[in-house]
């Protein structure tokens, strides 16, 4: 019984504001009136059940409900704010209502009064026959095409909780040129409804002549917000020709209450398409262009920064204990290859080989994924793959191919000088190149015991401890250690000077014993000791540290722990 065509109706949201001749005792400087109506005085009561205005919480009875026309609220105040407006439909099915975040801005003294109008086009797709008749009675257009739905679905699909926050920033961006206010008003309008019809919201602002006001212009001295509800002197009638006033960013009493209880709208039911604002020429040049641009940049940069914090966070850099805070950001582990790919591509655009082709051995997140799998897959307790000459080659059961070739190349180079080997090994295999180019990745701590820091960070083998937790901070933590024989002078600095051959042999042996260590209380002691040095890196599944970054005192303590475990 549902009609197959879409019906479009229009709503006009607007407000008027003027400076009072004399401020009230509460300090209110403006009288304002906000309204919802049909275009050209069409009777929207046919399909509108009620309109709810959510005023700022400082007003008495901030929730104002209008069940009959005129749907308007008149008040006095001294600053603008974002005013959520909910229009409830006389519809037995969804959508039952739509919500708009309206920017009720005021103006500076000495400028023309605000006379602002914003048009909303709501397109209901396949309404019920009963609701369709109501829409048509109110002047709905039954022949409206639905081609705009795709372009505006993002607006309609935003949840109303997020819309209030986006509207506050977008409303500030709408405070200048005519082109900017259409985009701001489109993002500040959000929908609240649920299912079977799609409402396309075409949203225009026809503002009048005006003056957009400076951010700081409306900040009254801090005063109590206990406002008495004052009916303002009546404004000019609603059908008066409209003038536009430029929107004032952030002129709120405080922050409007976000109405976040709305259900998440279905973009297939109601779409709200934004149109261009129509404005009369303003009497003075807009003064808020720079504000509007900066607000847009702030909004954009905040979202970019959020993405970058996940996509290019430095989980691969061994710094100091400051890196511990990365444990809290668990989501960076879930980013997987995306994080590494974006980080690498920033450093060396498309010159890197695809990570999928190189088995991702240098990807810490992939290591972590492998480690979680191989807890069940790998029966061998010492499953540490290594890129060095020491006797761990048989344990390379997971990472093969290019990694094995690195190990062989390095095996033949073991007796050369450190500085020479660093240069030679830069070209050992394709897998090393992303690490060398990545710069910050060359200091990734991993399980390597006989290679320069670049190739060892490329191989980044893992050792899997038993499932019970080794650390207080995380449940299934895995210990990763690295004791390179050859290392780049620019990458690591050893406190007691260059490692001599004997000391490095000790480190290799220490590494081997650490990899076979199974006593949990000893492992916990080691973790506690390394934590004191600050030379470690924690991921969701591993506790990584570099033996060469530790001083000899700490190394001796590690050896003593292992001696204890050997005798026990």
Curated annotation (Swiss-Prot):
Coiled coil: none
InterPro entries reported in the protein's UniProt record: AF-9_AHD (IPR040930), YEAST_sf (IPR038704), YEATS_dom (IPR055129), YEATS_domain (IPR052790)
Residues covered by the YEATS domain: 1-138
Positions of the record's site feature: KMT2A/MLL1 fusion point (in acute myeloid leukemia patient CO): 375
Region ranges (Histone H3K9cr binding): 78-80, 106-108
Site (Histone H3K9cr binding): 58, 103
Tissue expression from the record: Enriched in undifferentiated hematopoietic stem cells in fetal liver, cord blood and bone marrow.
GO molecular function: chromatin binding; DNA binding; histone binding; histone H3K18ac reader activity; histone H3K27ac reader activity; histone H3K9ac reader activity; lysine-acetylated histone binding; modification-dependent protein binding
Record motif Nuclear localization signal, residues: 295-300
Site (KMT2A/MLL1 fusion point (in acute myeloid leukemia patient F1)): 481
Ranges of biased composition (kind: Acidic residues): 357-368, 414-429
Residues where Phosphoserine is found: 288, 294, 412, 419, 483
Cross-link (Glycyl lysine isopeptide (Lys-Gly) (interchain with G-Cter in SUMO2)): 339
Annotated segments matching region Disordered: 138-475
Function according to Swiss-Prot or TrEMBL: Chromatin reader component of the super elongation complex (SEC), a complex required to increase the catalytic rate of RNA polymerase II transcription by suppressing transient pausing by the polymerase at multiple sites along the DNA. Specifically recognizes and binds acylated histone H3, with a preference for histone H3 that is crotonylated. Crotonylation marks active promoters and enhancers and confers resistance to transcriptional repressors. Recognizes and binds histone H3 crotonylated at 'Lys-9' (H3K9cr), and with slightly lower affinity histone H3 crotonylated at 'Lys-18' (H3K18cr).
Disease: A chromosomal aberration involving MLLT3 is associated with acute leukemias. Translocation t(9;11)(p22;q23) with KMT2A/MLL1. The result is a rogue activator protein. Fusion protein KMT2A-MLLT3 interacts with MEN1 and PSIP1.
Protein name (record): Protein AF-9
